[in-house]
Each structure stands twice: as structure tokens, then as C-alpha cells.
Design a protein with these regions (language model features):
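Structural preference for solvent-exposed beta-strand-turn elements
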Residues: 1-366
């Protein structure tokens, strides 16, 4: 069984699907990529059992399939190939004793590799999409990257709402119970509210600046440009009602400089003991914290005046300000000491929300 492909195209395709593979898996085949030649196409697949990456390139020759053994090493070798890549698959033995051996030849270079049987590879789920929409992959990824900090890593005990990217109408958002971040795009809207894990969406960068079709099945999401297909499981839960967490009215509004604010928070973080939770007391530009009965202070310039004293987690506020890195000013909207703190910037479609921390009475400075 023989087939011929363009070496560069094959190498690039193998690199793409390898991003879905597990580096160390209890099931060895999940560390490897499936290659299938059929109908003049070479289809490559990589999966970790949760996410599938599949792509195809033109091919000539017979129809056959195999699973790479030591995919990572094969991918390194393929990057050195140029021109026509010839792949030959030989079988030996029968039944449980059946073995595959793969020969790759390109120019004066050749290599013989063991291969797994394709029957050992997990089949991707069959989708019956009920809804679909089109979006630019690069634009969507940029929006996700701005807000994904407001998620937590998934564990068995973590609420799915806190680990996921939420899609609802023309908004995407994240929240972890202590903060939230969202972005609005009036040019498109999700046909139904849904949630996805954050990790698979990092693969959107493989599509570059292309428009992609997003297909929504009851349990899965498929994102494709017609050649590359990203398939992963949906989070089977109802997205959180973000509007219920956003204050509708604000008593005060001040402008801060993100760079200056982050620098002063970084100063306090470096000065205070590192094994403590950093609870910051903020009022009219004055920033104070107290750790182990020691008091630390600094201040920033405000455009506007604030009389509401609020408390917040230092790291959460730094993450929210980082969302607006590069902006000269950010508006901070306040309602009360116990209401969420809203951050936004002029001509930006994204927002951040930080939940306050209840403040204890602080002794007067010596």
C-alpha cells in the first residue's frame, strides 16, 4: 500500500493535529496521530478524547490507514522533508499478531517506523448540528484572549460556569464567582446561549484570519474552514445570566491610568509577605493594605473624586487592569462598598467586573 503527498503540506498538517494529543496518556494511542488515505485525500486526526483536530491534504495512491508510533519524533523528521513524500505501509501477521510497518521516503532520506492499527484509534463523534453561525477565527480568538483570565482551571469540584467561555447573544463572557469579563460584538450573535471549555478554543489560532463555520450539536461544537475541523464537547449547563451581576446604576465614576495603577499594586505585592491574600483598601486614589499588623500605603492620580471606600483582591484588580493594558485611561464605576466594581475604556467593547471584599476596621497609622 503506497501513497504520495507533498512533504511540506503533510508536515504542516501533522503539526496542526498534534496539538490535540496528550503528551503522556494512560492510553498510548492518545499520544499519536491517525493518518487515513481515501479518495485522493490524506486525512490526519489527533485527539485527547475530549478534543479532535482533523485536517486533510491532497494525495495520490492507494486507500489505507495507520496510526503513527512516536508521532512527535515523526513530526520532527517530516519538517526536514521537501518535495514528494512517499509513504508505504506493510502488514505482517494476522489477528492479534498483526503488525504494521511504515516506510517514509523523501529524496535521499528514508525512515522505517512501527505503526498502530487504525482500528485502535477512537472514532470522532457524529454530529447532528441544530444551529450554526459564521465568525472570523482571529477576531473571536482575540476577544477570548482578553477575557479568559476570569476563568479557573476545571476540577471535579469546580462549577462548570466558572471554567467555561459563555456565548449569549452578541456577548462572550467568563466569570469565576469573584470577577467577570465580557466582550460585545454587534456584528454577530450566537443563535442560542451555550458554553464551551476554554482550552479547546486556543486552537482557533490554527485557522489564522479565516472565517469559520461554528456548528452546534446537542453535545458537541464543530469549528471548520472546510479543510481543518476542530471538534470538542460542549459544557452541558445553562450559561449564567451576566446581566443579573452588573449594577444598573452607579454613584461614582473616576478615571485611572492602568499603567500607574498596576505599578502601585505591584509595589504593594512585592513589599507585603508573599504568603498572604492581598486585600486592598481603596478610596479617592489612596491605596492601603495591612498584613501581619504591618501597614503599606501608596496612591494614584484620579480624574474625578471618589468618597466610597472599597476593598478588593489585589490580584483580581491587576488582572482586570491588564485587560486594558495600553489604554491611557480606564473608567472605574462604583455603587457602594459591597457592590461590584466595573471597569471600562473609551471605544472598547470589553468590560471587567471585580467583586469587592468586605473590609475590616484598620487601626490608625502610627
Amino acid at each position: 500500500m503506497r501513497a504520495v503527498v507533498d512533504a511540506k503540506e503533510f508536515s504542516q498538517a501533522l503539526d496542526k493535529v498534534s496539538r490535540a494529543l496528550r503528551k503522556s496518556a494512560c492510553i498510548p494511542v492518545l499520544e499519536e496521530a491517525l493518518v487515513r488515505f481515501t479518495g485522493g485525500r490524506c486525512i490526519l486526526t489527533g485527539t485527547d478524547f475530549e478534543t479532535w483536530l482533523m485536517t486533510e491534504i491532497p494525495a495520490q495512491g492507494d486507500d489505507f490507514a495507520f496510526v503513527f508510533h512516536r508521532t512527535a519524533d515523526a513530526a520532527k523528521a517530516c519538517r526536514r522533508f521537501d518535495g514528494e513524500l512517499h509513504l508505504e505501509l506493510a502488514e505482517s501477521g494476522e489477528g492479534r499478531n498483526k503488525e504494521l510497518r511504515l516506510l517514509m521516503r523523501c529524496g535521499h532520506r528514508a525512515g522505517e517506523l512501527h505503526a498502530f492499527l487504525p482500528e485502535e484509534y477512537p472514532e470522532p463523534p457524529t454530529l447532528e448540528p441544530k444551529h450554526s453561525f459564521t465568525v472570523n477565527a482571529a477576531s473571536l480568538l482575540e476577544r477570548i484572549n482578553r477575557i479568559k483570565y476570569a476563568t479557573v482551571k476545571p476540577t471535579e469540584k469546580t462549577n462548570a460556569c466558572c471554567t467555561s467561555i459563555h456565548f449569549s447573544g452578541n456577548r462572550i463572557y467568563c466569570l469565576d464567582g469573584l470577577r467577570a469579563a465580557w466582550d460585545t460584538d454587534e456584528s454577530w450573535a450566537a443563535p442560542i446561549p451555550f458554553m464551551t471549555p476554554a482550552a479547546p478554543l486556543a486552537h482557533l489560532k490554527l485557522f489564522g484570519n479565516k472565517d469559520v463555520s461554528v456548528l452546534l450539536d446537542k453535545r458537541y461544537v464543530s469549528i471548520t474552514d472546510g479543510t481543518l475541523n476542530l471538534l470538542f464537547r460542549r459544557v452541558e449547563a445553562v450559561p449564567f445570566d451576566l446581566d443579573s451581576a452588573i449594577p444598573r446604576q452607579f454613584r461614582e465614576e473616576v478615571c485611572v491610568q492602568p499603567k500607574e495603577f498596576m505599578a502601585e499594586l505591584a509595589y504593594l505585592k512585592e513589599l507585603a509577605p508573599s504568603n498572604q491574600k492581598y486585600v486592598i483598601r481603596f478610596c479617592n486614589g489612596r491605596i492601603t493594605t495591612q498584613v501581619d499588623e504591618c501597614r503599606y500605603e501608596t496612591e494614584i492620580h484620579l480624574d474625578g473624586k471618589s468618597e466610597i471606600e472599597i476593598g478588593f483582591n489585589l490580584c483580581h484588580m491587576m488582572d482586570a487592569l491588564q485587560q486594558f493594558k495600553g489604554e491611557s485611561h480606564v473608567r472605574m464605576k462604583l455603587t457602594s462598598p459591597i457592590s461590584p466594581i466595573l471597569l471600562e475604556a473609551e471605544d472598547r467593547s470589553d468590560h471587567a467586573l471585580v467583586l469587592p471584599v468586605r473590609l475590616k476596621r484598620m487601626p490608625a497609622a502610627a
